[in-house]
Amino acid sequence: MKETMMETLSQRLNALQEKILEHYEQDSKLIYDQINYWKYVRLENAIFYAARERGMHTIDHQVVPPGTTSKAKAYQAIELQMALESLAQTDFNKEEWTLKDTSNEMWQTKPKQCFKKKGVTVEVWYDGNKDNSMHYVVWGAIYYKTHTDTWCKTEGYVDYWGIYYVHEQHKTYYEVFKQDAQMYGTSGKWEVHCNGNIIHCPDSMYSTSDDTVPTTELTAELQHTTPAHTAATTPCTKKTKSAPSCKCGVSRPSETDGVFVDLVTSKGCNKRRHQCCGDTTPIVHLKGDKNGLKCLRYRLRKFNSLYENISCTWHWIGGKGSKHTGILTVTYTTEAQRQKFLETVRIPPSVHVSVGYMTL
């Protein structure tokens, strides 16, 4: 009975993970495909949760996560799936929606429980010191839900006091610089650097003792516009003109449709293994979303003749590393084997490929 249950769960899990990996490979920009992705993730974690409840610790050589982990991920998937299904019922469904745009990391980034696109970095120097600075993001497009369950689209703006968007004629700040100034600074003053413009605090503004964000703004106008504020199907409350704000020019770096490949070699090394810094092994680092890498590693089993070893998913800690971005390391016996691997295996466009060497 237990073997039958194991086989059933294994078949369902394999089918779901195949669909998840196909989604990564397609690199779709349709909102309906992103809805399906989160449905697959929800079902995948439901299987893991059910397996753990039945005392299973592995399914077809895959480690079953703790029940609390699977439950939390399933809830995340449900939340994203429902939000996207709601958004898909509006005219915003005609826009491009990538896996990054609809990721849980983006959903939980400030302002939380909003979809966001086209981020631009703003640098704040506390005490006017560049070495004591923090980076924040102004979003060129913010999609939020009103109390009437209407999806609206607006833009992010920055002034001396923080970063905000306008909702029903009211500013909603999602970053307040004064709070961080109390934590990181000593003078209580700071400078906002955005697209080559600097926003300072005049003495008249600094003299206020109120902890709330003042209604009188100190802003620098980079573009002569007022915050855009549109609804998908029914109009939001019309916005009145306000003081000019700093809207950082929003642009996205161009992306190619293929896989990014970096060649990483040690200084002075030759491409041939027997000439490269002694006894080294050709490797490939596959960097991307952890869940996608897990599915990719599962699929790579059928190409096991094209590599020597493959690691579990890992990530850097500290520095510029991110716990949300995973890395798979694949080793090869020869450079020819590695080249055959890269020519044969289809790597999803969202996965960054780095080619290099390791001493093992």
From Swiss-Prot:
There is a cross-link at residue 287 (Glycyl lysine isopeptide (Lys-Gly) (interchain with G-Cter in SUMO)). The keyword DNA damage does not apply. Gene3D superfamilies: 3.30.70.330, E2 (early) protein, N terminal domain, subdomain 1, Papillomavirus E2 early protein domain. GO terms for molecular function: DNA binding; DNA-binding transcription factor activity; nucleotide binding. Keywords: Activator, DNA replication, DNA-binding, Early protein, Host nucleus, Isopeptide bond, Phosphoprotein, Repressor, Transcription, Transcription regulation, Ubl conjugation. The keyword DNA-binding applies. Its main location: host cell. Binds DNA as homodimer. Interacts with protein E1; this interaction greatly increases E1 DNA-binding activity. Interacts with protein L1; this interaction enhances E2-dependent replication and transcription activation. Interacts with protein L2; this interaction inhibits E2 transcriptional activity but not DNA replication function E2. Interacts with protein E7; this interaction inhibits E7 oncogenic activity. Interacts with host TAF1; this interaction modulates E2-dependent transcriptional regulation. Interacts with host BRD4; this interaction mediates E2 transcriptional activation function. Belongs to the papillomaviridae E2 protein family. Plays a role in the initiation of viral DNA replication. A dimer of E2 interacts with a dimer of E1 in order to improve specificity of E1 DNA binding activity. Once the complex recognizes and binds DNA at specific sites, the E2 dimer is removed from DNA. E2 also regulates viral transcription through binding to the E2RE response element (5'-ACCNNNNNNGGT-3') present in multiple copies in the regulatory regions of the viral genome. Activates or represses transcription depending on E2RE's position with regards to proximal promoter elements including the TATA-box. This is Regulatory protein E2. It comes from Human papillomavirus type 70. The gene is E2.
